[in-house]
């Protein structure tokens, strides 16, 4: 397994690169560069005429990409992956891409850096933005949002069963002292949560929900997946690693939707070609989860799921 820094171990690395790298001279997009683990492994598998375009909205990821500056096959673009269609248009890569990789979620360096505000285990500013140069912070949103809006976010994006109770406590507590720190929020959630789950901090779901909301994560995933259909050439691979059920359900639905032919009433005299006219993808194998050895090495990989699809037509 390739490690790009002492802090970061790429998840499902061998499995994802094996699925992705079908042409050693192809053009590939790593839509979630992070600290470059998957990009490095991919470049190691490719020939001199290959091309890898990496995207990331995190300024720290862009800085980490300097390690690849001497490789002429590599290009980094500072943009969220939801802008994938714009990147494809700008680089004239529609229907030209051999494989697109998405490694969703938060990287270990982001979680471990208290100043980013993603972790309830480390006290830091309540920020949670993937791109720290723009947008509303988690603290700003929590200190202004209506109780019902907070409750909806916690329930919808965190599947938090105590969403209303936590939202009410947030609104009540912020009147005395606005939320500014991760520890402040985590301790409040622990205080008001009536049930403590074994091996799970009470703030886990709330922090996930707020992060997804602040970064519009699910909306960005949907936009990027749709754009991938424009970019992939025939037989090109879509490879997606997700880390929680909301992401995985979204990816699974997307692949299933585009793997089905036209839905017609039974008994109609139509050819197989006509029935498959709207089919854009074909699922490749079953979902892949990390083995015991990987989970022991990197416990954060436990919830990860890898899904693979192949582009089946090019029009």
UniProtKB/Swiss-Prot annotation:
One of its GO terms (cellular component) is cytoplasm. S-adenosyl-L-methionine binds at residues 36-38, 56, 81, 103, 110. It is an enzyme of class 2 (transferase). Its EC number is 2.1.1.199. Keywords: Cytoplasm, Methyltransferase, rRNA processing, S-adenosyl-L-methionine, Transferase. Gene3D superfamilies: Putative methyltransferase TM0872, insert domain (1.10.150.170), Vaccinia Virus protein VP39 (3.40.50.150). It catalyses: cytidine(1402) in 16S rRNA + S-adenosyl-L-methionine = N(4)-methylcytidine(1402) in 16S rRNA + S-adenosyl-L-homocysteine + H(+). One of its GO terms (biological process) is rRNA base methylation. Specifically methylates the N4 position of cytidine in position 1402 (C1402) of 16S rRNA. Belongs to the methyltransferase superfamily. RsmH family. PANTHER family: 12S RRNA N4-METHYLCYTIDINE METHYLTRANSFERASE, S-ADENOSYL-METHYLTRANSFERASE MRAW. This is Ribosomal RNA small subunit methyltransferase H. It comes from Idiomarina loihiensis (strain ATCC BAA-735 / DSM 15497 / L2-TR).
């Amino acid at each position: 397994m390739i490690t790009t820094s002492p802090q970061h171990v790429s998840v499902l690395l061998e499995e994802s690169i094996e699925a992705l790298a079908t042409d050693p001279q192809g053009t590939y997009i790593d839509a979630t560069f992070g600290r470059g683990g998957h990009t490095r492994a991919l470049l190691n598998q490719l020939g001199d005429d290959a091309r890898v375009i990496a995207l990331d909205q995190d300024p720290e990821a862009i800085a980490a990409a300097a390690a690849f500056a001497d490789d002429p096959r590599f290009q980094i673009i500072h943009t969220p992956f939801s802008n994938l269609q714009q990147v494809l248009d700008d680089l004239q890569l529609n229907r030209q891409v051999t494989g697109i990789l998405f490694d969703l979620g938060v990287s270990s360096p982001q979680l471990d850096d208290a100043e980013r505000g993603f972790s309830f285990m480390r006290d830091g500013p309540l920020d949670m933005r993937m791109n720290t140069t723009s947008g509303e912070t988690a603290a700003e949103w929590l200190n202004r949002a209506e109780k019902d809006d907070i409750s909806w976010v916690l329930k919808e994006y965190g599947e938090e069963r105590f969403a209303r109770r936590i939202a009410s406590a947030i609104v009540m507590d912020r009147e005395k002292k606005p939320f500014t720190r991760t520890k402040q929020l985590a301790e409040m959630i622990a205080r008001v949560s009536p049930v403590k789950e074994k091996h799970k901090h009470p703030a886990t779901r709330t922090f996930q929900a707020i992060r997804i909301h602040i970064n519009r994560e699910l909306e960005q995933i949907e936009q990027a997946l749709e754009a991938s259909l424009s970019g992939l050439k025939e037989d090109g691979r879509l490879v997606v690693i997700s880390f929680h059920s909301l992401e995985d359900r979204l990816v699974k639905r997307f692949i299933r939707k585009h793997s089905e032919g036209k839905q017609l009433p039974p008994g109609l005299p139509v050819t197989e070609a006509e029935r498959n006219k709207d089919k854009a993808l074909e699922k490749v194998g079953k979902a892949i989860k990390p083995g015991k050895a990987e989970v022991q090495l990197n416990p954060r990989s436990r919830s990860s799921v890898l899904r693979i699809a192949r582009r089946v037509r090019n029009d």
